[in-house]
Each structure stands twice: as C-alpha cells, then as structure tokens.
Amino acid sequence: MDNKLDVFRRELVDVQGIPLFWSIAEQWSQVESFEARPDDILISTYPKSGTTWISEILDLIYNNGDAEKCKRDAIYRRVPFMELIIPGITNGVEMLNNMQSPRLVKTHLPVQLLPSSFWKNDCKMIYVARNAKDVAVSYYYFHQMAKMHPEPGTWEEFLEKFMAGQVSFGPWYDHVKGWWEKRKEYRILYLFYEDMKEDPKCEIQKVLKFLEKDIPEEVVNKILYHSSFSVMKANPSANYTTMMKEEMDQSVSPFMRKGISGDWKNQFTVAQYEKFEEDYVKKMEESTLKFRSEI
C-alpha cells in the first residue's frame, strides 16, 4: 500500500465473532498459525489494562534489572504485539519469528482466538485485568490518539460501544472471564492492575515466583523503580513517543496518560454510572471474578 495513511481510521472487521483491526483480519491465517515456543512468556491483557507496564517489568526481570539494556529498543519491539499487522508499518508475527528465545510475546486476543501452539507448548502466561470503568475511559482517550482504531465519537457514544463489545478485541466482560476460567487448566498467572498499583513490589514477587526466578532484593528494588509510572512516562523506550505521529498522535492524548485507579469518576455522569453498573451486574454475576473500581 503506497499511502500509509490509507491504513488508519478504518472500520473493524469480524473474526470469529470478535471485532479486530481490518489488517489483522486480512492476515488472520498468519496469526492463527503462529508457532509458539515452549519457553515463550505470553503477556495477555484486554487493551488499556497495564500491558506496557507488565511488559517493562518482565523485560527488566529478564535483564536482571539493568535499565540500560532495556533501553536497547522501544518496548513494542522488545515485546512484540503478536497479532498486530499493519501493511508497510509492522508485522508482529514476523518480528517474533526473527527473535531469539526466550521471547516475551504480547497479545490482546480473547482466549478463544489465541493460536493453539501456545496451549500445545504449555507456555507460561501472565494476564493482567483492570476494572471495566477505568478501561473504558482509558480506551476512549486511546482511540482519539491511536489511529488504527475507528473514530471513537463522543464519550457517550463510545461507552455504548464498549458495553456492547463493539470495540477492537471484543467485549471486556468475556475477555476477563475467558482468561479467568482458562487459568484452571493452564499455567496462567492472573494479576489485577489495582493490586499492581497498590503494592507493586508484592505483584513483582508473584511474577518472579511464577517464573521460578530468584533475584536479589536490590535488583527487585531496581525493577520496582524503573517500572514506576513516572520513570516509564519519561522513558522514550517505554512511552511510545518513538512511534510515528500518523500512528499515535500524543499531542491529542499521551500514550501514558494518568496510570491511576478510579479515574472513571472524572468521566462518568451519574446516569452513565447507573446504567453501566446495571449492565455490568448482568454480565458478570455468574463469574467468581471480583474487581475493585478504586484503591
């Protein structure tokens, strides 16, 4: 495609019942046949749930807390977004195929769309879930600056789409529940964004235990410092400022916007909150999953 701008702001395309970027849908066979390796670590989240944060933590762990090594490249190349394929711009599958093991692999796919090779290889997976209201707000601002998404419309219009699952990667509700159930069968560490905000050191220790890595206290403290929001926000290899403006326009909204829990209270009207909560209870009542909307 000659004009790179042709790839942006296009409508989503349905893949097995899930709306995805048109370019992922076009190249779906390439994603579906992705070959996982047994020592891959998969990072899975619904969008705007702390993906970049946990990715940076894992890269710091794999580099023994050496922040300079983690500045070797942008986070989206150190931890490739497996299914993201944009003609002439990026191809997550190809990037990963060219990487040496052990690889850190990022995905936003719901559990039913994950390439089967991850299950066959019994890969370790880390899932991070964040409360729905904060995700909806963050996703709205992300749509404004990340041009692979369709135009979000007004906040009210976007919230309706979010509740209906008519956003990229489908319904938040099914996504978090699907991965929650799957953890009973496979090696999945299920973390909560709110716990990571409240006690990041404790959550990093959980990750280390899951990965069977024993590292000294001073290295853990380094990881804690270099993965903090303020340090990452100022770090060009973590904050996506190296991405071209046509793809992500940070003058519209920064990629790392606030990084807090409870910001939804600044966005939702009382009527929106009541409608959202009523709908939420119906969709989540049969699940054992419990979220905190603030800390």
Swiss-Prot record:
User: What EC number(s) are associated with this protein in UniProt?
Assistant: 2.8.2.-
Q: Which residues bind 3'-phosphoadenylyl sulfate?
A: 48-53, 130, 138, 193, 227, 257-259
Q: Which GO terms describe its molecular function?
A: aryl sulfotransferase activity
Please provide the record's keywords in A-Z order. Answer: Catecholamine metabolism, Cytoplasm, Lipid metabolism, Transferase
Q: Which domain of life is it from?
A: Eukaryota
Question: Which family is this protein grouped under?
Answer: Belongs to the sulfotransferase 1 family.
Name the job this protein performs. Sulfotransferase with broad substrate specificity that utilizes 3'-phospho-5'-adenylyl sulfate (PAPS) as sulfonate donor to catalyze the sulfate conjugation of catecholamines, such as dopamine, prostaglandins, leukotriene E4, drugs and xenobiotic compounds. Has sulfotransferase activity towards p-nitrophenol, 2-naphthylamine and minoxidil (in vitro). Sulfonation increases the water solubility of most compounds, and therefore their renal excretion, but it can also result in bioactivation to form active metabolites.
Q: Tell me the protein's name.
A: Sulfotransferase 1 family member D1
Source species: Rattus norvegicus
